[in-house]
Amino acid sequence: MPLDLKNYPLLTNINYPEDLRLLKKEQLPAFCNELRSFLLNTVSQTSGHLASGLGVVELTVALHYIYRTPFDNLIFDVGHQAYPHKILTGRRDKMGSIRNFKGLHPFPWREESEYDVLSVGHSSTSIGAALGMSIAAEKEQQGRKVVAVIGDGAITAGMAFEALNHAGSLHNDMLVVLNDNEMSISENVGALNNHLAKILSGDIYTQLREGSKKVLSNIPPVKELAKRTEEHLKGMISPATIFEEFGFNYIGPMDGHNVIDLVDTLRNMRSHSGPQFLHVMTKKGKGYKQAELDPIKYHAVPKFTPDQDLPKSPPSSATFSQVFGDWLNDMADQDNKLTAITPAMREGSGMVSFSKRHADKYYDVAIAEQHAVTLAAGMAIAGLNPVVAIYSTFLQRAYDQLIHDIAIQNLGVLFAIDRAGIVGADGPTHQGVFDLSFLRCVPNMIVMTPSDEQECRNMLYTGHMLNQPAAVRYPRGTGTGIEINKQMSRLTIGKAKVVKEGKNLAILCFGTFLQQAYSVAEKLNATLVDMRFVKPLDKELLDNLASTHKEFVTIEENSIAGGAGSAVNEYFMSQQIKTSVLNIGIPDRFIEQGTQQEIYTLLELDSAGIEKQIVSYYSHLK
């Protein structure tokens, strides 16, 4: 239900940033209150990312107030915090559709708005892209400014520091804003600090600073004394001198919820040349007590009533993440050499309990997927048994390390790959539909696809007991609901399981689509196989099936291009087995947001769609 804009007298007249710039500066605090209230009430009705957006209301307003967007380029890293930005840039009345099928994209998206200059979703990309845009802006000489807004988590990644290092050496005009919500605003982020931030960013100070550099350049001892004096002044109010060493003019930290001071400081900084760095302190969930107290819980929320706690999910089957977390605890009880690594995805990967029960075996490396994988390599070389818990979409970021540091050395590292397949509302940047394709071509890798919770547990155990690289990939969400046997069984590598005997048509299923495929196999009197292993394939079974079946179907929740079905095709061709194979999976395109079921229906990956594809391909089955 759309919100009544009569309750938002200022916001109702703000459709685009040019409308915002018509407000008097003194009106901005009241406008921020309205924007924050609108954001809270909208997300509570629709679900979505909440706490991050609440924390950057003043910063977003100040940036659009001072910078001439969309002429100036404004980039938000990751994009969880971009809801206020979307509201201010022509999408206010569509916010009820965010993250929904055919609705607004969950993150800034270039195809959606000219104000979204970079499509995002993964972290730490903003500074590198901003530098590229600043280089182009310098060449076009039209006075275009470039701003990157990045959080304290995202800036810890190596890619962000690589970009900072490069930007400082090029000296292009650009502003990096560090949104630091790691802690609440501390005492040193008060009136004095905000005042000093305005002084340090002001024209008079800047002119004196640049002029003194020229005057003192020929007097090295005096120049060094002046530099140390400036560093001491900044050091009194900020520990972040590292950014000065990168070549940035550092300002801050300052209160990220004082919109008046932010406007004054940003106005000063917009007129400066060279790389600028503004450090603002914000509180995630600002203005909504429950979110301030538990920003992780309120990071992404379902529909809820703001004056009540979040609704509890109804009892359901265990999620695959929970299955992994339970296995990890049980395995750690047995194996003192087990270690578990996550790149900042403890909650999502089901590792909260493990991090407490086995704190000495738990390693959160922050947003550093490349490091996570090479860390595991070092552990394996030294005799430990590492498990890397990682989302499919984020494993893409560590592909070189997987090959160079793990596979080439044939190290015993287990990859527990969560969110494999269609993940839903986060859209193209988060769908985990490429891992089978990029894993199965890597020598020494064992790749497993469980069809249910028990098989997942047994595969994790099997992979952990191997002395070579292994991957178990499982989807987001709940499993089949079967009762899980705590006893772990080691599977025979490369052996599939015939689930149902049939005639002529054989359906080879990789993963949890086995449930959908079963009803189809019943209707078509087809043989159904739980393939279990993408690499190595059960070649003996394939040979036997090829001698008794004329037609094949492969089903997987992965890109058809290069996926498990392609592995079957390649094997049949290598053996000169002439048979017909239909590959069913993710088509060769990026998949939009929507619920998992909506996407399955769209791609004809539900039972009805799978049957339709098979009958359409093998027309005699109609």
From Swiss-Prot:
Pathway: Metabolic intermediate biosynthesis; 1-deoxy-D-xylulose 5-phosphate biosynthesis; 1-deoxy-D-xylulose 5-phosphate from D-glyceraldehyde 3-phosphate and pyruvate: step 1/1
Residue positions binding thiamine diphosphate: 80, 121-123, 153-154, 181, 288, 369
Any Pfam family the entry gives: Transketolase_C
Protein name as catalogued: 1-deoxy-D-xylulose-5-phosphate synthase
Recorded GO MF terms: 1-deoxy-D-xylulose-5-phosphate synthase activity; magnesium ion binding; thiamine pyrophosphate binding
UniProt similarity note: Belongs to the transketolase family. DXPS subfamily.
PANTHER family assigned: 1-D-DEOXYXYLULOSE 5-PHOSPHATE SYNTHASE-RELATED (PTHR43322), 1-DEOXY-D-XYLULOSE-5-PHOSPHATE SYNTHASE, CHLOROPLASTIC (PTHR43322:SF5)
Lineage of source species: Bacteria, Pseudomonadati, Pseudomonadota, Gammaproteobacteria, Alteromonadales
Catalytic reaction annotation: D-glyceraldehyde 3-phosphate + pyruvate + H(+) = 1-deoxy-D-xylulose 5-phosphate + CO2
The gene coding this protein: dxs
Role: Catalyzes the acyloin condensation reaction between C atoms 2 and 3 of pyruvate and glyceraldehyde 3-phosphate to yield 1-deoxy-D-xylulose-5-phosphate (DXP).
GO cellular component: cytosol
Note on how the cofactor is bound: Binds 1 Mg(2+) ion per subunit.
Binding site for Mg(2+): 152, 181
Subunit structure: Homodimer.
Any single GO BP term: 1-deoxy-D-xylulose 5-phosphate biosynthetic process
InterPro entries: Dxylulose-5-P_synthase, THDP-binding, Transketo_C/PFOR_II, Transketolase-like_Pyr-bd, Transketolase_BS, Transketolase_C, Transketolase_CS
Record-linked PROSITE patterns: TRANSKETOLASE_1, TRANSKETOLASE_2
